[in-house]
Amino acid sequence: MTTTTSDLTVLRAGTLDYEAAWEEQRRLHESVVTDKHGDAVLLLEHPSVYTAGKRTEPWDRPMDGTPVIDVDRGGKITWHGPGQLVGYPILRLPDPVDVVAYVRRVEQMLIDVCAEFGLVAGRIEGRSGVWVPADDRGPARKVAAIGIRVARGVTLHGFSLNCDCDLTYYDRIVPCGIRDAGVTSLAAELGRPVTVADALPVVERHLPTLVGA
């Protein structure tokens, strides 16, 4: 399904292998760079896969030989899979390119999405992503991860929002290289089902906040 506004095309790709999604990202990126296509966002789920960003250390990886795909985004290792909504914004950033400001816009968009579901989430100084603050249930917990790259002024990679995924997949790795915090999902925090299908229209409604600022 494709939704287009005057500024942004949103492509719902269903479930897509990581390599196929990466190929589509690169195709869209080239089209945006060469002005053949306007800003676009891919929204999808992946089959279970681990991906390692450029700052991943050997000890962050699974110890049991689980396959890992090395990618050219920032950040460290993470997991993608069923029950997690992944977004790949392919956006031309205004000059001068401010990567930190873009990451903050992505974070705020996801914070606003969480708020619509009734979950209070925010930022932690020095750490990217969106977090549920420490409370009597435990330390701070990441509900959404962000890892991006900017090439020729246009973004690649993006964000992942844990909806109702199996959180035990994170037990094999040091997610995003952070040992002193946890990982969570909308469903785990709210105590009710929140599926990718539930999250899709909410995320889609907030995506225009990423464009043109």
Curated annotation (Swiss-Prot):
Gene3D superfamilies, alphabetized: Bira Bifunctional Protein, Domain 2
Reaction catalysis annotation: octanoyl-[ACP] + L-lysyl-[protein] = N(6)-octanoyl-L-lysyl-[protein] + holo-[ACP] + H(+)
Chief location bin: cytoplasm
Enzyme Commission number, as recorded: 2.3.1.181
InterPro entries per the UniProt record, alphabetical: aa-tRNA-synth_II/BPL/LPL, BPL_LPL_catalytic, Octanoyltransferase, Octanoyltransferase_CS
Localization (cell): Cytoplasm
Positions of the BPL/LPL catalytic domain: 35-213
UniProt superkingdom: Bacteria
Family of the protein in this entry: Belongs to the LipB family.
Primary role: Catalyzes the transfer of endogenously produced octanoic acid from octanoyl-acyl-carrier-protein onto the lipoyl domains of lipoate-dependent enzymes. Lipoyl-ACP can also act as a substrate although octanoyl-ACP is likely to be the physiological substrate.
Further remark: In the reaction, the free carboxyl group of octanoic acid is attached via an amide linkage to the epsilon-amino group of a specific lysine residue of lipoyl domains of lipoate-dependent enzymes.
Protein name (Swiss-Prot/TrEMBL): Octanoyltransferase
Organism name: Salinispora arenicola (strain CNS-205)
